[in-house]
Amino acid sequence: MLPPGRNGTAHRARLGLQRQLAQVDAPGGSAAPLGPAQVVTAGLLTLLIVWTLLGNVLVCAAIVRSRHLRAKMTNIFIVSLAVSDLFVALLVMPWKAVAEVAGYWPFGAFCDIWVAFDIMCSTASILNLCIISVDRYWAISRPFRYERKMTQRVALVMVALAWTLSILISFIPVQLNWHRDKAGSQGREGLLSNETPWEEGWELDGRTENCDSSLNRTYAISSSLISFYIPVAIMIVTYTRIYRIAQVQIRRISSLERAAEHAQSCRSRGACEPDPSLRASIKKETKVFKTLSVIMGVFVCCWLPFFILNCMVPFCSSGDAQGPRTGFPCVSETTFDIFVWFGWANSSLNPIIYAFNADFRKVFAQLLGCSHLCFRTPVQTVNISNELISYNQDTVFHREIAAAYVHMIPNAVSSGDREVGEEEEAEEEGPFDHMSQISPTTPDGDLAAESVWELDCEEEVSLGKISPLTPNCFHKTA
């Protein structure tokens, strides 16, 4: 986002002046040739920008092309996220990359507009990530209410609010100059000479030395709260609760699998052997935890260092000879710029994290012309997707389990019949516990089998599609 405000120093001003004089005095009046470090920097930043563009364009194209993807309300938020990341790659990254390689800001008065774009696009990207986490939590914790309430209109209103807030904290303060530290900009300590103030030495031949801006403390803290700290707190809460819900559902459904496998083993072999379902359940829980850790870990690692520095810089003191050092120590411009690019790099990772579930991958394969190469063998994976967690497994073994359920679980009976034959049923149930009882209201008596098919036998099933279970381990009906 916004580069750091600096209490300018004479040393930095002299370096900028010397660099620009060297460029002006180059043979033929042209800029000096790029050094090895500049070439490497240009190559890396170009790759980052191109990857960000291609990844987010591919996400948008996949949703536009696929009717199935367009039908999901969640993908409205994915599109909004991809658009905000596209804007980062188009309106923010290229200009800063040129300035990094050139060593100065060559675009003059465009600086203020670029700063506004920077704040707007970065804030919109983060707010969209927050909305996705809230959307997934609602879908998983209250699925039936979510299906009724989460309409296209509601989704568009949520997206509009995110973009409106991003514009309000960017263009209005920047264009009205509310974001600058006026005292700092008027009273720079650094002088090019004993009489030349920093601002007058900031430009040479119409070329601005830098596009940095001194943020006032109020704007730095308030914008950081809105753009990062409040959204990240919401994301931590929602993903923690999602993990707990997923853990409960995985364990309940796994108990049905263990009961079926145990009974099948006892009847076929005449002896009961331990089954691997418990280990599989633990593996699934571990994968869910890893998935959520990746989502939060990537986001926090990319943005947290920048926003810590963004709040520290307005309070830092350069410790010049004119006064004692107070507040936080200032950070170097290079350090700050590195963390700025770390934050922007999050826009290149979002397409991988949020749009790489099986549904998206199929459309990606069609768009790229590699459908046969990408989907030859089913591999058990946990995908980070727009619906958060997806299991994609080979279903042969689970079809056998479902068939065992169909043959082994007794048909549903009325409450009167259950009281009469309670003792006989208890003997026939064998290893089945109370968690595997069939509810009297079950229409088919095969609800347990359906739950297994729902979890393991669909091509792509996510926690967003798993309905909450009743205390008897059956899905609620609307």
Swiss-Prot record:
> Where do the record's glycosylation annotations fall on this chain?
N7
The UniProt keyword set, sorted, is:
Cell membrane, Disulfide bond, G-protein coupled receptor, Glycoprotein, Lipoprotein, Membrane, Palmitate, Receptor, Transducer, Transmembrane, Transmembrane helix
Between which residues do disulfide bridges form? C111-C211
Cytoplasmic face: residue ranges?
65-75, 135-153, 241-289, 358-478
**Keyword Membrane recorded:** yes
Q: Where is this region: Disordered?
A: 416-446
Chief place of localization: membrane
Q: Which ranges are annotated Acidic residues under compositional bias?
A: 420-430
Q: Which domain of life is it from?
A: Eukaryota
In this UniProt entry, which residues carry a covalently attached lipid of the kind S-palmitoyl cysteine? C370
Q: Which residues lie on this side of the membrane: Extracellular?
A: 1-38, 103-111, 180-215, 318-335
**Summary of the function given for this chain in its UniProt record:** Dopamine receptor whose activity is mediated by G proteins which activate adenylyl cyclase.
**UniProt family annotation:** Belongs to the G-protein coupled receptor 1 family.
Q: What is this protein called?
A: D(1B) dopamine receptor
- Annotated organism of origin: Mus musculus
The UniProt gene name for this protein comes to: Drd5
